UniProtKB/Swiss-Prot annotation:
Listed GO MF terms: ATP binding; catalytic activity, acting on a protein; serine-tRNA ligase activity; transferase activity
Annotated binding of ATP, by residue: R262, S263, E264, E349, I350, S351, S352
Annotated binding of L-serine, by residue: T231, A232, E233, E285, S385
Protein name per Swiss-Prot or TrEMBL: Serine--tRNA ligase
Source domain of life: Bacteria
Membership in a protein family: Belongs to the class-II aminoacyl-tRNA synthetase family. Type-1 seryl-tRNA synthetase subfamily.
Metabolic or biological pathway, per its Swiss-Prot or TrEMBL entry: Aminoacyl-tRNA biosynthesis; selenocysteinyl-tRNA(Sec) biosynthesis; L-seryl-tRNA(Sec) from L-serine and tRNA(Sec): step 1/1
Domain-related comment: Consists of two distinct domains, a catalytic core and a N-terminal extension that is involved in tRNA binding.
Organism: Halalkalibacterium halodurans (strain ATCC BAA-125 / DSM 18197 / FERM 7344 / JCM 9153 / C-125)
Reported function: Catalyzes the attachment of serine to tRNA(Ser). Is also able to aminoacylate tRNA(Sec) with serine, to form the misacylated tRNA L-seryl-tRNA(Sec), which will be further converted into selenocysteinyl-tRNA(Sec).
NCBIfam families in the record: serS (TIGR00414)
Catalytic reaction annotation: tRNA(Ser) + L-serine + ATP = L-seryl-tRNA(Ser) + AMP + diphosphate + H(+); tRNA(Sec) + L-serine + ATP = L-seryl-tRNA(Sec) + AMP + diphosphate + H(+)
Keywords from the UniProt entry: Aminoacyl-tRNA synthetase, ATP-binding, Cytoplasm, Ligase, Nucleotide-binding, Protein biosynthesis
């Protein structure tokens, strides 16, 4: 949620920045007109209150002079009734403005590239060498099926499309990756491990920005106002909702493993095969609560933590700075890590690392005090995938495939796999 004071002070400037997102900003325009109406109502209320006070003094004077004041008393009552009606109008306007604020996206940071499509995203750096196979590389779903480690056909029978049934060494690989990532972020990067609920309430989904705009993308529990989480970002960020932290607590860093559930409503026809785009998938999340002046340094740090996973797995990747049109609703700045997928001959997203500044903190009311009796300020929140596990499985299968159909297991994972060195049929 944007700072309403900032919006009122620099409406034209914010509108100009939001227009670079290429989104419908009619809600912002409506906010401007409603806010002006609200200002006019406030002026009218103040005028009426001033008149009521004046009439009250005149009534008192007439009574002291033992003169008739009935006409003024009636006027005072009429004015009070009008004020009461305008107060109700103000209440309704404030509710409408609050709802409009919830639907306005975050303002892009000045360092975010301006662009109209994903083609305008900017490559920041690359790491690792793209493999040069002496054979035609196979897609991960074909490799996994041939090895019997992921069963897509039976998953479709049990549930439907965009689900996977991990089996045997495949299930063990998924678990090994989760443990490896969690150990790395806890032991080496200093994150506190948390295990969140997979169901959250409407207030939590609103706090992190999934609601109200993206409700159709969420899985909702029938007859309960609960939602299956689309990412651990939701429960973990809301861990400190409606709290005032102390400055010495910051930065707070959490890492969480969770299952994630997404309807992929806008992805019809995209990535219908394999592990890239699933309705249910595992992910290790990184969430940080920081002081505002530190948040962009913290974004670089968090992004580096996600990169370290790929480096230790020796998977080639690149870091992209997402342009204004590809930024997402809540972020002021976002990096995507894209891992090399040989069968597609391209890089694919495996992590997004975002700085939301105070956008989520305002929605979730998360503050901190620099001094014990100081004014409470909103924290800045950041999050990133560290990493999406299914996509990491896909990248390992494709980048470590051998001509005979076997898959070499990355060395860093072998202790988690009981010393296993390769997958073979």
């Amino acid at each position: 949620m944007l700072d309403i004071k900032r919006l009122r002070k620099d409406f034209a400037g914010i509108r100009e920045k939001l227009q670079t997102r290429g989104e419908d900003i009619s809600g912002l325009e409506k906010f401007g007109s409603l806010d002006e109406k609200r200002r006019q109502v406030i002026v009218k209320v103040e005028e009426l209150k001033s008149r009521r006070n004046q009439v009250s003094q005149e009534v008192a004077q007439l009574k002291r002079e033992k003169k008739d004041a009935d006409h003024l008393i009636k006027e005072m009552r009429d004015v009070s009734d009008e004020i009461k009606g305008l107060d109700e109008t103000l209440r309704q306007l404030d509710e409408e403005l609050d709802q409009l604020l919830l639907a306005i996206p975050n303002v892009p940071h000045e360092s975010t590239p301006v662009g109209e499509t994903e083609d305008d995203n900017v490559e920041v750096r690359k790491w690792g060498e793209v493999p040069n196979f002496p054979f035609e590389p196979k897609a991960h779903w074909d490799l996994a099926t041939a090895l019997g480690i992921v069963d897509f056909e039976r998953a479709a029978k049990v549930t439907g499309s965009r689900f996977a049934f991990y089996k045997g060494a495949g299930a063990r690989l998924e678990r090994a990756l989760i443990n490896f990532m969690m150990d790395l972020h806890h032991d080496k990067h200093g994150y506190e491990e948390v295990l969140p609920p997979y169901l959250v309430n409407r207030t939590s989904m609103t706090g992190t920005g999934q609601l109200p705009k993206f409700e159709e993308d969420a899985f909702k529990i029938r007859e309960e106002d609960y939602f299956l989480i689309p990412t651990a970002e939701v429960p973990v960020t809301n861990l400190h909702r409606d709290e005032i932290l102390s400055a010495d607590q910051l930065p707070i860093a959490y890492t969480a493993y969770s299952m994630n559930f997404r309807s992929e409503a806008g992805s019809a026809g995209r990535d219908t095969r394999g592990l890239i785009r699933q309705h249910q998938f595992n992910k290790v999340e990184l969430v940080r609560f920081v002081a505002p002046e530190d948040s962009y340094d913290e974004l670089e740090k968090l992004t580096g933590h996600a990169e370290k996973v790929l480096q230790l797995l020796k998977l080639p990747y690149r870091v992209m700075s997402m342009c204004t049109a590809d930024l997402g609703f809540t972020a002021a700045k976002k990096y995507d890590l894209e891992v090399w997928i040989p069968s597609a001959n391209t890089y694919r997203e495996i992590s997004s690392c975002s700085n939301f500044e105070d956008f989520q903190a305002r929605r979730a009311n998360i503050k901190f005090r620099r001094e014990a009796k100081g004014k409470a300020e909103f924290v800045h929140t950041l999050n990133g995938s560290g990493l999406a596990v299914g996509r990491t499985v896909a990248a390992i299968l494709e980048n470590y495939q051998q001509e005979d159909g076997t898959i070499v297991i990355p060395e860093v994972l072998r202790p988690y796999m009981g010393g296993m060195e390769k997958f073979e049929a």
